[in-house]
A protein has these predicted regions:
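Membrane-embedded beta-barrel scaffold of Gram-negative outer-membrane proteins
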Residues: 54, 60-66, 84-170, 255, ...
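Short loop/turn motifs that connect adjacent beta-strands in outer-membrane beta-barrel proteins
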Residues: 14, 56-58, 100, 152, ...
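Signature of Gram-negative outer-membrane beta-barrel scaffolds
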Residues: 1-54, 77, 171
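Gram-negative outer-membrane beta-barrel transporters
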Residues: 13-17, 26, 109, 131-218, ...
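Outer-membrane beta-barrel translocator domains and adjoining extracellular loop/strand segments
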Residues: 29-36, 72-80, 115-124, 162, ...
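Conserved C-terminal beta-signal and adjacent last beta-strands/turns
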Residues: 63, 90-92, 180-291
Length: 291
């Protein structure tokens, strides 16, 4: 079952308040060789509240607090007893919006109890295994922008800087202290540069950098995934025929056009790493017909 309520209140021309309430009732019943006997009932109350303050037409700040609960999934039950996770999320942000730039900045602190984290291991059918981290957090800064450099040029940068930590981690009776959460890079940077020599033609350079990350939660050196930087190129041209179709869009995408050899994911078997290498240079073409 699910119940949801939402309210907004305009205090002044500049200040507005909002609140959300959600109640979820989840019941799991199963009896199989994979899961064993399961008869669990979860009752989650997920509130959210915050405020927006508009300084002027271009600048707005916001603050919010939310609690979210999440139940384990079937795969979690198949791989051992796990508990639902609870998240307390606090966010503070600023939005700038004018004719030449749209800028969004957000600072977040996410405090978890029993966070369901990836362990880096796979089960016998290749599904990722998760377990509970009794206490953990994610603290970060997110920034994205759209900047009009001229009528022909536009740039859309974004980045995330974060610290993602298990606190007082204990794995099968061994104490590890505070360690990085698996598959959680602390630096992610992206950019899109768009050139439109004419209105119908768009040429885009897409770039992404992902910092190093780990494939387990105890910072084993062998579990490290190196950082990588990938470049893609996209071109699109729009026709506006007078009959049948309102619009025809031709597009082409060259992924990893520098043919970079990199690994973006992997898993651990005990202390031994395995990797998923990504494709080198590859091409896609598209045709979009709009009636």
């Amino acid at each position: 079952g699910n119940f949801f309520a939402k309210a907004n209140y305009q205090v002044t021309e500049q200040l507005s308040l909002f609140g959300d309430l959600q109640y979820r009732h989840v019941q799991y019943k199963a009896d199989s060789p994979e899961t064993g006997l399961v008869n669990d009932t979860f009752r989650f109350f997920n509130p959210k509240a915050g405020l927006n303050y508009k300084f002027d037409e271009a600048n707005t700040m916001y603050f919010s607090y939310a609690r979210a609960n999440r139940e384990p999934n079937r795969t979690d039950y198949e791989n051992g007893g796990v508990r639902p996770e609870t998240l307390d999320d606090v966010e503070l942000g600023w939005r700038l919006n004018n004719e030449k730039i749209q800028l969004n900045t957000n600072i977040y602190y996410m405090a978890y109890k029993n966070q369901l984290i990836l362990t880096g291991k796979l089960d016998d059918v290749g599904a990722p295994i998760r377990s509970n981290s009794e206490k953990s957090y994610r603290l970060g800064l997110e920034v994205d922008a759209t900047i009009a450099l001229s009528e022909q040029w536009m740039v859309r940068p974004n980045f995330t800087l974060s610290a993602n930590k298990n606190v007082d981690l204990n794995v099968t009776g061994t104490y590890y202290g505070t360690k990085d959460i698996a598959y959680s890079p602390s630096v992610i940077v992206g950019n899109v540069l768009v050139f439109s020599p004419i209105k119908a033609l768009h040429l885009s350079l897409l770039q992404k950098f992902v910092g190093e990350q780990l494939m387990n939660n105890i910072e084993l050196p062998a579990a490290k995934l190196a950082d990588y930087f990938v470049n893609d190129f996209n071109v699109s041209y729009t026709f506006k025929p007078k009959t049948i179709f309102k619009e025809i869009v031709l597009s082409g995408l060259v992924n990893n056009f520098l043919d970079k050899k990199y690994v973006s994911n992997g898993y651990m078997y005990d202390i031994y790493p395995s990797y998923y290498p990504q494709a080198g240079i590859n091409f896609l073409a598209g045709l979009n017909l709009k009636f």
